[in-house]
């Protein structure tokens, strides 16, 4: 029996380094339970080639730096590569094209038509409320919203990883009668392979000036929607003797803005500790946090 070919476009690719979609795709191929599926995953790169990773075919996509439109161009180039690959291979079984996030409004109708001509189907994960992000200008927010509407209208199946997102899609776009399904993300419940006294963990604690079980932990991208400002402000007003460890991406502009507002650098308990891409180390850091603070406002998932 011919394999079911699934083409995934919209993440930055695998192996995952950061991001919810990237981690989702990485775990999807890692825990594949049948050999009847062949995944093809687009990966943003500075070259055009391909390689195998955990059984998935990963194809690199080189995209010119065109500024804010780079992500849109990446999706389009990747989708075109998927379509051309399918034409060349002439699969007997209908291919599945799975798009992550709603970026390509002006092109979705023609893409859907091309997929249909191949006998394929088009799936979409609409992500969170991207159009609500305060980092976007009004015009960009408007584009995200109209792109969301067009893509939900033209895709064959909307896969939601949040019950609230599925409810929103069904209610907001009821006139299109969208075909939706809720599929939650799994969770890795296995403890870290690192021992409590592993030098990798203890060395990290020493480097960051932290003590095991004596810190509150925040993990997520450093963007306004993750409410880092609120977390820091309220933490500064507390009397706890524990630290606040913030594992996050770099955003110097936001960092400077919050420093001007809050003067958090004067509070030695608050520690920006950079990113952690070693998943076993990150697990161990989470295991020894006194508590985890989650301030995410528009995301459904958060992995750093």
Regions found by a protein language model. Give the residues of each.
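Conserved donor-binding/catalytic core segment of Leloir-type glycosyltransferases
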Residues: 7-9, 205-226, 232-239, 245
């Amino acid at each position: 029996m011919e394999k079911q070919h699934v083409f995934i476009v919209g993440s930055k690719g695998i192996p995952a380094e950061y991001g919810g979609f990237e981690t989702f795709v990485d775990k999807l191929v890692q825990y594949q339970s049948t050999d009847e599926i062949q995944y093809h995953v687009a990966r943003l790169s500075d070259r055009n080639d391909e390689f195998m990773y955990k059984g998935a075919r990963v194809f690199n996509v080189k995209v010119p730096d065109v500024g804010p439109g780079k992500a849109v161009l990446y999706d389009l180039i990747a989708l075109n590569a998927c379509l051309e690959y399918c034409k060349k291979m002439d699969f007997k079984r209908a291919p599945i094209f799975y798009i992550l996030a709603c970026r390509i409004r002006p092109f979705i109708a023609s893409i859907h038509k091309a997929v249909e001509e191949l006998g394929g189907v088009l799936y979409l994960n609409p992500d969170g409320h991207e159009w609500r992000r305060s980092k976007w200008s009004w015009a960009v927010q408007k584009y995200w919203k109209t792109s969301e509407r067009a893509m939900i209208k033209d895709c064959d199946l909307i896969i939601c990883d949040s019950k609230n997102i599925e409810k929103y899609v069904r209610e907001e776009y009821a006139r299109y009668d969208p075909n939706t399904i809720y599929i939650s993300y799994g969770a890795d419940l296995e403890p870290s392979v690192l021992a409590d006294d592993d030098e990798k963990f203890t060395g990290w604690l020493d480097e960051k000036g932290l003590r095991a079980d004596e810190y509150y932990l925040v993990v997520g991208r450093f963007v306004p929607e993750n409410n880092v400002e609120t977390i820091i402000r309220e933490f500064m007003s507390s009397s706890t003797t524990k630290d606040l460890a913030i594992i996050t991406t770099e955003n110097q502009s936001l960092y400077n803005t919050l420093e001007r507002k809050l003067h958090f650098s004067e509070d030695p308990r608050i520690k920006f500790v950079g990113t952690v891409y070693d998943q076993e180390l990150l697990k161990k850091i989470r295991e020894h946090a006194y508590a985890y603070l989650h301030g995410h406002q528009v995301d459904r998932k958060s992995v750093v």
